[in-house]
Amino acid sequence: MPKYRSFKTTHGKNMSGARSLWRATGMNDEDFKKPIIAIVNSFSQFVPGHIHLKKVGELISDQIQKSGGVPKEFNTIAIDDGIAMGHSGMLYSLPSRELIADSIEYVINAHCVDAMICVSNCDKITPGMLMAALRLNIPSVFISGGPMEAGKIRKNEKEIKIDLVDAIMIGGQSNQCKNFIKEVELLACPTCGSCSGMFTANSMNCLTEAIGLSLPGNGTLLATHVDRKNLFIKSAKTIVKITKEYYHHNNKKVLPRSIASKESFENAMILDIAMGGSTNTILHLLAAAQEAEIDFNMSNIDELSRKIPHICKVSPSTSLYHMEDVHRAGGVMGILGELNRANLLNKQTQNILQLNLEETLKEYDIVLSKNPDILKMFKAKPAGIRTIQPYSQENRWLTLDYDRKTGCIRSCKNAYSQDGGLAVLYGNLAKNGCIIKTAGIKKSNYIFSGPARVYESQEEAVNAILKGEIISGDIVVIRYEGPKGGPGMQEMLYPTTYLKSMKLDKTCALITDGRFSGGTSGLSIGHVSPEAANKGVIALVKNGDIINIDITQRVINLNITEQELQQRIFQEESKKSLSYKPLNRKRHISYALKTYAFFAMSADKGAVRDRQKLSKI
């Protein structure tokens, strides 16, 4: 049987000093016989998705202790992408993912921790923790803080739902009155929790369910609902249970790398495509797969995107549904249940419940479940009360949304589209691929051509859009915003939202080697690989060049001859030390960001560090 890792610091005569320090944290002789379980929290007063996690950490700690473990809590950093967006702060968001993963490794290995429960929620925190769990491969459970309730506002004598993207969009409308802008600002984000649409945070928390590292309900159960408290308690019990399962019974099936197999990654990607999740999830799944040493790449994603239907449409792809509505329709398990009935899933993947997927769906898919407690959990309803207190209300729907024909979650037969919500495009403009979220795009825009309007920074593009320099039919190209070129691969929510506010979102396209917020909609193509700073063809595009996009055929091409392309490559490389660099951009790059840029690979590799460079150090 494997020994507790923590015994290296709690057993043996030569560890008296370490034990003395452990005692100073409140431990005693009995505790030295138990597993030390880290509560990897991400509480922060900067982020509404994390503002309530201090209480959550205390709740989990108490339950771990009751269940026979020794809880030890520490925090990771957490950046709010919505607050960091629209200025140089967004350069730091993606690089923080690597720092989160590294900091967890440092604390866990320095203190010989036996297991960990990851309390995450927002955009880069869940991926960073997932990378760490797969790197360390100790018993791990994920539990998110839960989604925010959708905002509500009265317009034209009707109550409509709103969210963060509405606040950004309306703020960008030059003809909008200040009073209405303020009203939306006050109502768009009413509670603690991750922003209420199928943005990056909620997408990732749904994917941890599909992978099998979190309990059913994790991705969709509201932060404010009392049922979330039960989920925290159950997660705490689960981490103690699987920790003992591994160390007492040598059951390696409960370890992250056993659970997060290639088949589990495929299930997660299938879910992502079916629900039209954030394009950022692709970046993070590719990065996590490398930590798990799994061969999962853009080709796998492309293959899946061609056969998975789009069966769940949520904001920002529609204003009708938010995460609270997905939950009422059965949550992640409801979506997976429909995919399973169409034989589109790997059914034998395992999870932290020590069940395979098919067994889990029998219990948690509302179409199949006979368990009244589970059906009651999916009736959790928003309260519509402004609060930052977790599990503070217990409202319930009278009925569940079983409508698989016209409801929030649909059967594969009644899908919103037989094409999935995400697609990978290839061509001379993106030799290694690029990503588009098709969930919010009309079929009439699946084939699109137009002249390029080229910008070498997000700021430059935003100014052009707001000044009215972009017209219907244009393709906005924003380059040198990739992992290396930015550096940091900024999100482009402001450019896409401002195109929407200018009524250009359905008649223009945007292409970038940067990335998009989960709140992005419209004809927005990101993750162009190779990026401009890595000698990608996007660096060679000129104003007025025609770009051809064909989503149906999965093609994106710069419409110039091969001879012209080679001539442009020659001209660019003749600039020598100035080649493949933005020439007119004024941007301060800190040493921390330069370090990230030096090691960063393009988006098709998950924007992770180049291990070949590391091996040469």
UniProtKB/Swiss-Prot annotation:
Cofactors demanded by this protein: [2Fe-2S] cluster; Mg(2+)
Cofactor binding remark: Binds 1 [2Fe-2S] cluster per subunit. This cluster acts as a Lewis acid cofactor.
Functional pathway: Amino-acid biosynthesis; L-isoleucine biosynthesis; L-isoleucine from 2-oxobutanoate: step 3/4; Amino-acid biosynthesis; L-valine biosynthesis; L-valine from pyruvate: step 3/4
Reactions the enzyme catalyzes: (2R)-2,3-dihydroxy-3-methylbutanoate = 3-methyl-2-oxobutanoate + H2O; (2R,3R)-2,3-dihydroxy-3-methylpentanoate = (S)-3-methyl-2-oxopentanoate + H2O
Binding site for [2Fe-2S] cluster: C122, C195
InterPro entries xref list: Dihydro-acid_dehy_C, DihydroxyA_deHydtase, DiOHA_6PGluconate_deHydtase_CS, ILV_EDD_C, ILV_EDD_N, IlvD/EDD_N
Positions of the catalytic residues: S517
Keywords linked to the UniProt accession: 2Fe-2S, Amino-acid biosynthesis, Branched-chain amino acid biosynthesis, Iron, Iron-sulfur, Lyase, Magnesium, Metal-binding
Binding, Mg(2+): D81, D123, K124, E491
One Pfam family per UniProt: ILVD_EDD_N
Keyword field contains Iron: yes
Family: Belongs to the IlvD/Edd family.
Protein name stated in the entry: Dihydroxy-acid dehydratase
Organism: Buchnera aphidicola subsp. Diuraphis noxia
